[in-house]
Amino acid sequence: MIQTKSETITREFTTSAKNRGSYWITTFGCQMNKADSERMAGILQAMGYQKAKTELCADLVLYNTCTIRDNAEQKVYSYLGRQAIRKKSSPHLKLVVAGCVAQQEGESLLRRVPELDLVMGPQHANRLEDLLNQVDNGQQVVATEEHLILEDLTAARRDSNICAWVNVIYGCNERCTYCVVPSVRGKEQSREPKAIKLEIEDLAKKGFKEVTLLGQNIDAYGRDLPGISSSGRRENTLTDLLYFIHDINGINRIRFATSHPRYFTTRLIEACAELPKLCEHFHIPFQSGDNEVLKRMGRGYTIEKYRRIIDKIRELMPNSSISSDVIVAFPGEDESQFQNTLKIIREIGFDQVNTAAYSQRPNTPAASWAEQLPESVKIDRLKELNLLVEQTAKDKNTRYHNQIVEVLAEGINPKNQEQLMGRTRTNRLTFFSKIGPKKYSYNPGDLVKVKISEIRAFSLTGSPIQ
C-alpha cells in the first residue's frame, strides 16, 4: 500500500521566459549532483536562460560541487579562481556555487571568493529562481539553512533523452565517521510515491526508456513517510515503491542506487527477482573487508552480513552484476585489515569497485583521530587495490565472451562515429556497430541484441545479431 505525506509542498514557476542570457553548469561528484544539475538547468531555461556554447562565454556560471574528497573540493577552487579573474572584465557575469562545498563552507566562500553572487546548498537547488531574483536585486546571497525540499514541477533539462535520473530520497541520517554527506545534504527527506510516479510517467511520455532511482541510501526510502501495515511492517519502503512504479508503460528498465547494506532486505531482493523491468545490477558499498574497521567507520553491519546479501542476490539472480565502493588506509587500518579488504574483493568477485584512499574531511570524527596513515601508505595501498579491481573486473567480463546480451543504445561512441554505445541490463558499457544484419540501422533508444566478441576490464564490444 502506498501512502503520501499531506505536507508535501509543490511549486510551479510563473516567470516569463524572456531572454536572460546564457548559462553553463559544471557538475562535480555523484549521481545525486548530476540529477540536481539537470533540475537546475531546467529552472534556468524556464527563466529564459539558454545553454552557452562554452563556459567562457556564459553569462551565468554555476558549479555544482562535491566535498566527499579533498581533491574534488580543491578542483572547485581552481575553477572559481579563473572565473573570478574573468568577472573583473565582465561584471555582468553571475557566479554561483551550489552543492556540498557551498553547504560546508557557507559565508566563508564569499570571503575567499568575494566575486561570488550566490552560494547555495543542495537542499536549495529547487529554489534557484527565487535566489537568482534576489541576486538581480543587488544582493549577495547565501542559502545554506536546513530547508524542506520543494517538489519542483519544472521539467529538468536532461543530459540524455533515453535514460533519466529520478531523485526519490534526499539527505542521509547515517553517521559514518569518515563522511561529510549528512552535514551537507541534511536529514533524509523521501518524496511522495505519487510524485515520483508522475515524474516517471512524464518521462515515459517523452520517450525515455530507463530510469535510475537515486538516493544517498536509497533502501532507506520511506522511513520518514507514514504507513504501518496490519502486520506491523513499515509501508512505503523502496520495495513498495518498485511495485508501485513497475508497470508504467514505455519504461523498459528500472535501476536504483546507492544501497546501504544495513537496509538491504531479503524482501527487496525477492522483488527485484520477480519484477522483470528491474535490472540485474546492484551497487552496494562495503567500504572495508574488516569488521573492526567497519565498526570504527560506523557502518552498522559486519562483512558476514554483507556476504549474506550478495549470496541471496546470486541465489535468486545468478547472472547479476555487483559493484561497490571501498576505502583503504582508514585511520588505524593495519596491513592485515587491508589484506582482508583484498580478500573480500577476490572472494566476492565484484564487476566493478569505486576505490579511494581515506581523505580527512572537516566536521567528521575520523578526521581528528591520531592514527592517520602516511600518504605513502595511502598511495601504495590504493595502487595495489586498483590493480586487483581491474583484474577482477576483466575476469568477470570473460563470462560475456561469445554471449548474446541486450543493450539499450544510449548514443554514438565519441571515439568511433560508426558505433553506438549503451549498457547491458547488468550495467556493462558496450560498443557495437550502428549497422546490423541486412544493413539494418540502429539508433539511440533501441534495445539491441549484441553478440560480444571483445572484452576489456570495464567495457565490452560486439555486433548486433538481429
UniProtKB/Swiss-Prot annotation:
Keyword tags: 4Fe-4S, Cytoplasm, Iron, Iron-sulfur, Metal-binding, S-adenosyl-L-methionine, Transferase, tRNA processing
Taxonomy, superkingdom: Bacteria
Protein name listed in UniProt: tRNA-2-methylthio-N(6)-dimethylallyladenosine synthase
Gene3D superfamilies: 3.30.750.200, 3.30.750.210, Methylthiotransferase, N-terminal domain (3.40.50.12160)
Amino acids binding [4Fe-4S] cluster 1: 30, 66, 100
Family: Belongs to the methylthiotransferase family. MiaB subfamily.
Main location: cytoplasm
Residues where [4Fe-4S] cluster 2 binds: 172, 176, 179
EC supergroup of this enzyme: transferase
Function per UniProt: Catalyzes the methylthiolation of N6-(dimethylallyl)adenosine (i(6)A), leading to the formation of 2-methylthio-N6-(dimethylallyl)adenosine (ms(2)i(6)A) at position 37 in tRNAs that read codons beginning with uridine.
Obligatory cofactor(s): [4Fe-4S] cluster
Self-association state and partner proteins as the record states: Monomer.
InterPro entries: Elp3/MiaA/NifB-like_rSAM, Methylthiotransferase, Methylthiotransferase_CS, Methylthiotransferase_N, Methylthiotransferase_N_sf, MiaB_methiolase, rSAM, TRAM_dom
Species assigned in the record: Prochlorococcus marinus (strain SARG / CCMP1375 / SS120)
Protein's cellular compartments: Cytoplasm
Residues covered by the TRAM domain: 398-466
Signal peptide: none
Catalysis performed (reactions): N(6)-dimethylallyladenosine(37) in tRNA + (sulfur carrier)-SH + AH2 + 2 S-adenosyl-L-methionine = 2-methylsulfanyl-N(6)-dimethylallyladenosine(37) in tRNA + (sulfur carrier)-H + 5'-deoxyadenosine + L-methionine + A + S-adenosyl-L-homocysteine + 2 H(+)
GTP-binding recorded as keyword: no
Organismal lineage: Bacteria, Bacillati, Cyanobacteriota, Cyanophyceae, Synechococcales
Residues of the Radical SAM core domain: 158-395
